[in-house]
Amino acid sequence: MKKETKKKIVSGFNQILIFLGIFIAITWWQQKDMLPTSSSLRAPNFSLVDMTDNVVHFNPSEQTQKTLVYFFAPWCSVCHISIDNIESIKQSSDGKINFYAVALDWKSKQEVETFLAEHDLTMPILLGTNETLNDFKIGGFPSYYVIDSNGILQSKDMGYTTEIGMRVRLGLVEL
């Protein structure tokens, strides 16, 4: 192999390492204020109204299966892209996982309905409050928490995630 070719390969590899380092640093920075995932921290309880004005209660100590809680804002363009990934996962999970989508930072129920009109969703859509935002330490949209069957925070993420990335976090795909 020529010396120039080796230099280009090394340079490309170094650029990939720099990109990965920056990506990891940004991801850490985005998630640093979210609730920690650990072997003992239970997810917060909530009682929120759904889009048909029914109250939905979530108590992690009563969990019997894994749950994904997806927090979105109706004005968030990334949320428009990622919520369809979540719905696709829900459709294929055969009811083995609970799914909740929680609207935050909304001004009116109509604003949330306008967002939902662009998506064919079957998961419960809940109207979150400032208390919900604070309890789950949501600092950006979309944000996700995976909660295990014991109510323990297992995984978290903020920003766009691919469908395969979320399937891995939910344990639906093994690497």
Residue locations for each model-derived region?
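Structural microenvironment flanking redox-active thiols in thiol-disulfide oxidoreductases
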Residues: 80-119, 128-134
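Generic structural signal for well-ordered beta-strand positions
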Residues: 56-57, 154
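Thiol/disulfide oxidoreductase modules built on the thioredoxin-like
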Residues: 117-121, 127-174
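Short, small/polar residue-rich loop motifs at catalytic or cofactor-binding pockets
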Residues: 42, 65, 139-141
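N-terminal targeting signals for export/organelle localization
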Residues: 1-49
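Short active-site neighborhood of thiol/selenol oxidoreductases, capturing the structured segment around
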Residues: 57-80, 99
